C-alpha cells in the first residue's frame, strides 16, 4: 500500500506516510516494554508505580521515548489505550522542577477531559512536586488570572478558547513553553476550534516540540501536522475491538464500602458455579480481600503487579486449568487476562477511569462469548455508574435474585 499511498498523497496533498483512508503508517519501531528501562527520573517512576501502572501499554512502549527525546510525534490512538499517561510522563520527564515557569501546554476538546488530564499529571508528578493548572471555560476568569499571575504552574492544560484568552491577555506566558500537546485533535477540530488552535500556535515559540494525538486522521488534522510539525515520528496503535454485547450487567447497591465483604461472601456459592474474576482498584486491597476471604475459609487466588513473573504465571496456569476458581486482581491485569471460560466478573470497586470498565468485562467481539458482570455500588459510586452507562451507551440493571441461572 505504501507506494500507492505516496502517489495518492502527492496528488491530493496529504503528507508522506499516510494512507488515503486516514490511517498513519508507523515510522518508529523502537519498543521499550518496561518503565524501568526508559531512563526516567526516580521521583517520576515512583509516581508511575504509585498510580498503579505496572507495565507500559502499547502506545506507552512506543511513544514515550521519542517524546522524551524531543521529537515531534503524531500518535493515532483511541481513548482507553493509555495515551494520557503517555504525554503526561513525557512532559514530567522534561520538566525543570526548580524553574517556576510554565514549560508545557496541553489542549483538550472538553473541560471534562482537561480536568481528567490534570488529575493524571498531578498524580504521576506527585513525588516531583509538579504543578498543573486546568484552564477551562465555565470558571471565573478573574480567579484564573490571579492564579496564573501568582505563580506560573509548570504545566497548563485547557480547552482552546480559554487557553487562547489567557495567552492573549498575557496571563499565560508562552516564553518558556517547550512542549505543546494536542489531545483528541480530531475532536477539537470537529468542534470548531481550528482558528483558536492556529492562533495559539502563532503565540508559541517556533522551535516548540509538538505532540499530537488523534483517534482519526481527517484532512483538517493532517493540515495541522503539515503546517506545525517537523519530521514527526508517526505511531499507530490499533485498539482491540472490545464489546459489551452479550454481557449481562448488573449492580448491587451495597450502600457502604464496609458492607462489600459480606455481599461478596453471600455470592461465593454463585461464583464457584463457574470461574470468576474480582477486580479491585489497588494492590493493597487485593491482599486485604484475599486475607479476609481466606480467614473465612473461602478459596481464592490473588494476582497483582508486586508479585514476580514466576508467581504470576503459576497462578494464571492454575486459573486457566480451572483448579482455582476465583481470582482477585487489579486493573492492570484486566488487559492480560484472556481466560476463555470466565463468565463472571465482579467489580468489587468500580474502575477509577471508565475506559477500564470495558477492559474488565468486555470480550473480543469475534468470540461473542456470553457473560455476567456484577458491580458493587456504594452511595458515592452511583454517579460513576451513571457515567459508565452514558459513556458506553449501555444499561446496568439491579441484580435479580436468580442471577445463578444466568451464569
Curated annotation (Swiss-Prot):
PROSITE patterns: DEAD_ATP_HELICASE, HELICASE_ATP_BIND_1, HELICASE_CTER, Q_MOTIF
Consequence recorded when altering residue 364 to E: In NEDHSS; likely pathogenic; dominant loss-of-function variant unable to fully rescue lethality in eif4a2-null Drosophila
Top-level taxon of the source organism: Eukaryota
SMART domains in alphabetical order: DEXDc, HELICc
All copies of domain Helicase ATP-binding, residue ranges: 64-235
Residues that coordinate or bind ATP: 77-84
Effect of substituting residue 243 to I: In NEDHSS; likely pathogenic; dominant loss-of-function variant unable to fully rescue lethality in eif4a2-null Drosophila
Modified positions (Phosphothreonine) in chain numbering: 159
InterPro entries from the UniProt entry: DEAD/DEAH_box_helicase_dom, EIF4A_DEADc, Helicase_ATP-bd, Helicase_C-like, P-loop_NTPase, RNA-helicase_DEAD-box_CS, RNA_helicase_DEAD_Q_motif
Keywords annotated in UniProt: ATP-binding, Disease variant, Helicase, Host-virus interaction, Hydrolase, Initiation factor, Intellectual disability, Nucleotide-binding, Phosphoprotein, Protein biosynthesis, RNA-binding
Molecular-function GO terms, alphabetical: ATP binding; ATP hydrolysis activity; helicase activity; RNA binding; RNA helicase activity; translation initiation factor activity
Effect of residue 216 to I: In NEDHSS; likely pathogenic; fails to rescue lethality in eif4a2-null Drosophila probably due to a toxic gain-of-function effect
Region feature (Disordered): 1-22
Task of the protein: ATP-dependent RNA helicase which is a subunit of the eIF4F complex involved in cap recognition and is required for mRNA binding to ribosome. In the current model of translation initiation, eIF4A unwinds RNA secondary structures in the 5'-UTR of mRNAs which is necessary to allow efficient binding of the small ribosomal subunit, and subsequent scanning for the initiator codon.
Family: Belongs to the DEAD box helicase family. eIF4A subfamily.
Subunit and partners: eIF4F is a multi-subunit complex, the composition of which varies with external and internal environmental conditions. It is composed of at least EIF4A, EIF4E and EIF4G1/EIFFG3. Interacts with EIF4E. May interact with NOM1.
Name of protein: Eukaryotic initiation factor 4A-II
Organism: Homo sapiens (Human)
Gene that specifies this protein: EIF4A2
Amino acid at each position: 500500500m505504501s507506494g500507492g499511498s505516496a502517489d495518492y498523497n502527492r496528488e491530493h496533498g496529504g503528507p508522506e506516510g499516510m494512507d488515503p483512508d486516514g490511517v498513519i503508517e508507523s515510522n518508529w519501531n523502537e519498543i521499550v516494554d518496561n518503565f524501568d528501562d526508559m531512563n526516567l527520573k526516580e521521583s517520576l517512576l515512583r509516581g508511575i508505580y504509585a498510580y498503579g501502572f505496572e507495565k507500559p501499554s502499547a502506545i506507552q512502549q512506543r511513544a514515550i521515548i521519542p517524546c522524551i527525546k524531543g521529537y515531534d510525534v503524531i500518535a493515532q490512538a483511541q481513548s482507553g489505550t493509555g495515551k494520557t499517561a503517555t504525554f503526561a510522563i513525557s512532559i514530567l520527564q522534561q520538566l525543570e522542577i526548580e524553574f517556576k515557569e510554565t514549560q508545557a501546554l496541553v489542549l483538550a476538546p472538553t473541560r471534562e477531559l482537561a480536568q481528567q488530564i490534570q488529575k493524571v499529571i498531578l498524580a504521576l508528578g506527585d513525588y516531583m512536586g509538579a504543578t498543573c493548572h486546568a484552564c477551562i471555560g465555565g470558571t471565573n476568569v478573574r480567579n484564573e488570572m490571579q492564579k496564573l499571575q501568582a505563580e506560573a504552574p509548570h504545566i497548563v492544560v485547557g480547552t482552546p478558547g480559554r487557553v487562547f484568552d489567557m495567552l492573549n491577555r498575557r496571563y499565560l506566558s508562552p516564553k518558556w513553553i517547550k512542549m505543546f500537546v494536542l489531545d483528541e485533535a480530531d475532536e477539537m477540530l470537529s468542534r470548531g476550534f481550528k482558528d483558536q488552535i492556529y492562533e495559539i500556535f502563532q503565540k508559541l515559540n517556533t522551535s516548540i516540540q509538538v505532540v499530537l494525538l488523534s483517534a482519526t486522521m481527517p484532512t483538517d488534522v493532517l493540515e495541522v501536522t503539515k503546517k506545525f510539525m517537523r519530521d514527526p515520528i508517526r505511531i499507530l496503535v490499533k485498539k482491540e475491538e472490545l464489546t459489551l454485547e452479550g454481557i449481562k450487567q448488573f449492580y448491587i447497591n451495597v450502600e457502604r464500602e464496609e458492607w462489600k465483604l459480606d455481599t461478596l461472601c453471600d455470592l461465593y456459592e454463585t461464583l464457584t458455579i463457574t470461574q470468576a474474576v474480582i477486580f479491585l482498584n489497588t494492590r493493597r486491597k487485593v491482599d486485604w480481600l484475599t486475607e479476609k476471604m481466606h480467614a473465612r475459609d473461602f478459596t481464592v487466588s490473588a494476582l497483582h503487579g508486586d508479585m514476580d513473573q514466576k508467581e504470576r504465571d503459576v497462578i494464571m496456569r492454575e486459573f486457566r486449568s480451572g483448579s482455582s476458581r476465583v481470582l482477585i486482581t487489579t486493573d492492570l491485569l484486566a488487559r492480560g487476562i484472556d481466560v476463555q471460560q470466565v463468565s463472571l466478573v465482579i467489580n468489587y470497586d468500580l474502575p477509577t477511569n471508565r475506559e477500564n470498565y470495558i477492559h474488565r468485562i468486555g470480550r473480543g467481539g469475534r468470540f461473542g462469548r456470553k457473560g455476567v458482570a456484577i458491580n458493587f455500588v456504594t452511595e458515592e459510586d452511583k454517579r460513576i455508574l451513571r457515567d459508565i452507562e452514558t459513556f458506553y451507551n449501555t444499561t446496568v440493571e439491579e441484580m435479580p435474585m436468580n442471577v445463578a441461572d444466568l451464569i
